[in-house]
Every structure is written in structure tokens, then in C-alpha cells.
């Protein structure tokens, strides 16, 4: 059944019909389409298109249809309808006859599809928020469990300054907090109903759009029908948020892949989220993390795709907008799956504390402390930086750590240095000194963990 055949003399070419059909992917919107259709049927009662009895028959048939789909989800895909709207209308008519043909009065697929999409996106946002918050909780759990594990912090993948594993965890808590904020912000603009906009210029029926919007759980209704059916900003924003968050997940994965490598050996990943080699029996590969890292690309691709689809598109609805869905559906599923896997990885992670500390002791990550020490003794920072660099070069030549250099060597570079230098360049001292807000000092980390536990209601 086609919803638009009256004006045409010839049947659609079969190849074109398949090319034109969106049912193979927009069937995902079946619950939203039925939900919005029930709300629409109630509005049609208020304007005299339907009687109360007719509306109840339509609603009952739609609910029955939803239950049938629940029991046999393949039922939709076994048909050859153009889209989910035509599938629902055709099956409604099969159930209740001519009455089913009244439902589409005053409504266009143009406002229908964007309403369905907004309802679907709203539902998915709450699922994603739960997954992100759960991941944050796992970061906090791991941070609290390992708050005394000192490891190197890196710049340019070179050891830079000592940090703790807890501090690393808290960095990602902040990243994902921004992701939560973005989703909540998107929700404000998404939560506006376009239903009742018609094809592009509004509906000729005096529908109470405010009441209709609230009945579907929206906060308000849109103000311009032409914009309403054209608007896909909310998809751009949602795909942008997913791209940013997947970038965070990809960086998280890259960090752990390196930490898990034989060269670093900071962590051990659980057998449950790794795999082996078909040839090399010793291998334990971080497949879960590598897949998250790779899947980031497909999500970024979906964002680029929707931007390109919209960039030269005239108002209002154009068939190009059919291409707004597959990337969206895939991206949000990929994002949520990646969040769930990231939580699994964290839940089962084991730290090699000794390896972490040994790595922090190497690479002269305490060199900055010498510069700060000399500044406190009265030297300018630029000169102190130079002296510290010379001492690092000397330690490299002697194949020693800075802590192992004799006091006489320190003093040969600056008379300001006394034997208190040693207590100032221990790893613990490096951490304790960075007690400004946001610093790596253990007390600051404990405060931050408490604040985050309070925010996430896990005290």
C-alpha cells in the first residue's frame, strides 16, 4: 500500500521502490509512531474528525498492533511497505477498516517523522545518561580503590610528572561529566513537539498543539511549521555529543591499551574482555578497547554525513532527510555499547602497583621539583629551569636517577642546594606540593572523590 498513489498513472519501478523504501531501518520508530498516532487521534476528537467511540477503536487497534510487534518483531520486516508510517496505517486499516483511514487527517509524514525521531531521541538520551553516569561511578570506585598508586603522567608520550592512577580516573570523570551536561542541554531544545505542523504550513484543523505536545511528554510546541519539518538541528547536536563522547572513550581506550602493553605493564585486563591469538599462544589482546577506539570513527562519520546532507538543503522536507536515520540509529547504539563495555573493562581492571611506581621513578619526572626548589631559594625560574636541565643531563651521563646523585654534584651546579634537596624530590613530595585546586595532591584527590560520590549519590 502506498500513501500517495492517486496522482500517478504508472506503478513504481520495483528497483526504485526498494531504493526509496526506509522501512528496513525506520521500523525502529514503530513504538514512537504508534504513541504519537494515539495522541493525534485524541486531538482529532477535539476538532470533530473522530467521535470518542471511533478514537477508542483506533487506540485499541494501535495498542493491539504494538503488542503483536512485541511478540513478533520480524513481522514488520517481512512486509514491503515504503516506511513505518505506511506499514502502521495499512495494518490499522486491516484491523478496523475504513475508520483507520481517518487517522491521517490533518497530519503529514513530514511532521510525523520528526515527531517520531524526537520521541526516540528523548528516550535514548535517558538511556545514554544512565550509561555515562554508571561509567563515572566505576571510575570513582577504581579511583578510591587505588588512591595510593603512583604512576607517571605523560606529555608527548614521555614521562613528565608523577601522578596517581586515581588522578587519571578523575580526569575521565570530568570528561564524561561534560558529556552529561551536553545531553541535558540538547534535551532542552529537543523537547519541543513539531506534531500539528502538517506538510510545511500548519494544519487546517484547529488542533490544540500545546495540549497535544504535553500529552506526548514534550514541554511545548514549535512556533513555525516550515522550520518544524525542516529542523534536524537536534540530530546534529546529538551526533556531535556522541562524537565528542566517543572521542573521550577512544582516548580512554588508547591510554589503557598502552598501560596494558608489555612495555608499560601498569595494568592487567580481565580475561572476560580480551581475546587470544590463533597462532601465538602467549597473546592476550585488548580487543574490547581496540574496538571502542575504532568504532569512534563510524560515529564521527555519521556526524559528517548529516552535516553534508543538510548543508545545501532547501526548506522544508526533502527526501534527502531519509538519510538522517541510519547513521543516528547506529551511532547511538555504538555509543551506548561502548559505554557499557568501558564499564566492564573498569570493573575488572587490576593494577600492577610496583610497575607503576618503578616507571614513575624513571624518566626524571621529578626534575621540575628541583627548579621549584631553587626558585624558593631565591633563583629566577628561568635560571632554575636551566640548572635543573643540566642536572638531568648529568644524571643521564652517570646512568643514575636524580635522587641518587651525590650532594656534591648538586652543589657543583648551584650553591643554593643543601641536603634538604632529597626530601623535596621524592615522588610523594612531588604529589603533596601540588595541592592547589585540581592538583594531584592526595588530599585534593580525596576531596574530589568525596564530591563526586556525593554528586552521584554513592556515599
From Swiss-Prot:
Keyword annotations of the record: Amino-acid biosynthesis, Arginine biosynthesis, Cytoplasm, Lyase
InterPro entries, alphabetized: Arg_succ_lyase_C, Argininosuccinate_lyase, Fumarase/histidase_N, Fumarate_lyase_CS, Fumarate_lyase_fam, Fumarate_lyase_N, L-Aspartase-like
Gene3D superfamilies: Fumarase/aspartase (C-terminal domain) (1.10.40.30), Fumarase/aspartase (Central domain) (1.20.200.10), Fumarase/aspartase (N-terminal domain) (1.10.275.10)
Reaction(s) this enzyme catalyzes, per UniProt: 2-(N(omega)-L-arginino)succinate = fumarate + L-arginine
GO cellular component: cytosol
Top EC class of this enzyme: lyase
Keyword Amino-acid biosynthesis among record annotations: yes
Biological processes per GO annotation: arginine biosynthetic process via ornithine; L-arginine biosynthetic process
PANTHER family in UniProt: ARGININOSUCCINATE LYASE
Family membership noted in the UniProt record: Belongs to the lyase 1 family. Argininosuccinate lyase subfamily.
Protein name: Argininosuccinate lyase
Protein source organism: Buchnera aphidicola subsp. Schizaphis graminum (strain Sg)
Amino acid at each position: 500500500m502506498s500513501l500517495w498513489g492517486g496522482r500517478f498513472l504508472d506503478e513504481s519501478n520495483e528497483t526504485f521502490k526498494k531504493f526509496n523504501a526506509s522501512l528496513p531501518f525506520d521500523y525502529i520508530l514503530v513504538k514512537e509512531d504508534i504513541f504519537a498516532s494515539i495522541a493525534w487521534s485524541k486531538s482529532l476528537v477535539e476538532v470533530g474528525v473522530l467521535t470518542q467511540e471511533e478514537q477508542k477503536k483506533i487506540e485499541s487497534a494501535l495498542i493491539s498492533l504494538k503488542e503483536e510487534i512485541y511478540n513478533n518483531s520480524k513481522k514488520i520486516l517481512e512486509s514491503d511497505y515504503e516506511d513505518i508510517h505506511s506499514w502502521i496505517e495499512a495494518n490499522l486499516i486491516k484491523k478496523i477498516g475504513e475508520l483507520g483511514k481517518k487517522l491521517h487527517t490533518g497530519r503529514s509524514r513530514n511532521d510525523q517523522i520528526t515527531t517520531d525521531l524526537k520521541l526516540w531521541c528523548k528516550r535514548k538520551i535517558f538511556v545514554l545518561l544512565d550509561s555515562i553516569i554508571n561509567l563515572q561511578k566505576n571510575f570513582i570506585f577504581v579511583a578510591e580503590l587505588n588512591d595510593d598508586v603512583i604512576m607517571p603522567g605523560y606529555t608527548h608520550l614521555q614521562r613528565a610528572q608523577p601522578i596517581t592512577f586515581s588522578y587519571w580516573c578523575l580526569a575521565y570523570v570530568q570528561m564524561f561529566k561534560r558529556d552529561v551536561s551536553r545531553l541535558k542541554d540538547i534535551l532542552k531544545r529537543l523537547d519541543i513537539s513539531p506534531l500539528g505542523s502538517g506538510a510545511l504550513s500548519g494544519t487546517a484543523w484547529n488542533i490544540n498543539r500545546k495540549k497535544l505536545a504535553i500529552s506526548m511528554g514534550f514541554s511545548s510546541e514549535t512556533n513555525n511549521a516550515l522550520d518544524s519539518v525542516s529542523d534536524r538541528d537536534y540530530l546534529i547536536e546529538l551526533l556531535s555529543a556522541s562524537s565528542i563522547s566517543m572521542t573521550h572513550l577512544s582516548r580512554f581506550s588508547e591510554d589503557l591499551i598502552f598501560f596494558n602493553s608489555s612495555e608499560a605493564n601498569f595494568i592487567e585486563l580481565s580475561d572476560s574482555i580480551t581475546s587470544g591469538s590463533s597462532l601465538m599462544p602467549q597473546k592476550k589482546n585488548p580487543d574490547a578497547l581496540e574496538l571502542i577506539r575504532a568504532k569512534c570513527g563510524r560515529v564521527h562519520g555519521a556526524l559528517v554525513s548529516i552535516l553534508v546532507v543538510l548543508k545545501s538543503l532547501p526548506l522544508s522536507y526533502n527526501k534527502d532527510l531519509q538519510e538522517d536515520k541510519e547513521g543516528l540509529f547506529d551511532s547511538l547504539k555504538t555509543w551506548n555499547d561502548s559505554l557499557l563495555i568501558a564499564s566492564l573493562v573498569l570493573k575488572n581492571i587490576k593494577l600492577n602497583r610496583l610497575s607503576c611506581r618503578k616507571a614513575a621513578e624513571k624518566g626524571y619526572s621529578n626534575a621540575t621539583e628541583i627548579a621549584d626548589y631553587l626558585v624558593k631559594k631565591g633563583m629566577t625560574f628561568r635560571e632554575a629551569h636551566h640548572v635543573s636541565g643540566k642536572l638531568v643531563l648529568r644524571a643521564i651521563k652517570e646512568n643514575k636517577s636524580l635522587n641518587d646523585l651525590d650532594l656534591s654534584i648538586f652543589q657543583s651546579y648551584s650553591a643554593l642546594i643543601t641536603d634538604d634537596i632529597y626530601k623535596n624530590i621524592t615522588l610523594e613530595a612531588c604529589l603533596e606540593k601540588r595541592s592547589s585546586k585540581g592538583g594531584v595532591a592526595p588530599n585534593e584527590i580525596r576531596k574530589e572523590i568525596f564530591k563526586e560520590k556525593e554528586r552521584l549519590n554513592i556515599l
